[in-house]
């Protein structure tokens, strides 16, 4: 498994992916992605490896019906915090969930639920860049927003998007994720709900 992750990380790097994009593709932390790209498949020093869990949800992501079912469960979690005007997906992997959740939430409430997209700083090549909400989707100012991502690894991206939303005059009401590897229950007063929480023993 580890050699396969190293191979995938090196392949993604050769295709021009940033460390943040590699981390997202492999569902690992940026530190782990950086470590993987520096390894060779023949000499792996396990002592130096960051403590992390690789998450593979290909069987879910490859099926639109499975994505719809899981998104409905995530929408159900979000609705306990009230009606949202906008569902914001964190690029790249949070966007399909957010799209399907907005549809489900609109059907449940009878109100139109818009879609917004956030591009986190970890996807930017410029060191001084900031994360940004795409101008091609819904505006968030004055709106009640549910934030959606696939995996929380460190919590930095979630904290970043909550800060950006508040700075733009939005009211984030909840964060929903498929998998939480960090055990985060709230970010800056915004509750975090996960379908699956991974805990390390020992």
Curated annotation (Swiss-Prot):
GO terms for molecular function: DNA binding; orotate phosphoribosyltransferase activity. GO terms for biological process: pyrimidine nucleobase biosynthetic process; regulation of gene expression; UMP biosynthetic process. Keywords: DNA-binding, Transcription, Transcription regulation. InterPro entries: GfcR-like (IPR022854), PRibTrfase_dom (IPR000836), PRTase-like (IPR029057). The keyword Cytoplasm does not apply. Gene3D superfamilies: 3.40.50.2020. The keyword Transcription regulation applies. HAMAP family: GfcR. NCBIfam families: PRK02277.1. This is Transcriptional regulator GfcR. It comes from Methanothermobacter thermautotrophicus (strain ATCC 29096 / DSM 1053 / JCM 10044 / NBRC 100330 / Delta H). The lineage of its organism: Archaea, Methanobacteriati, Methanobacteriota, Methanomada group, Methanobacteria.
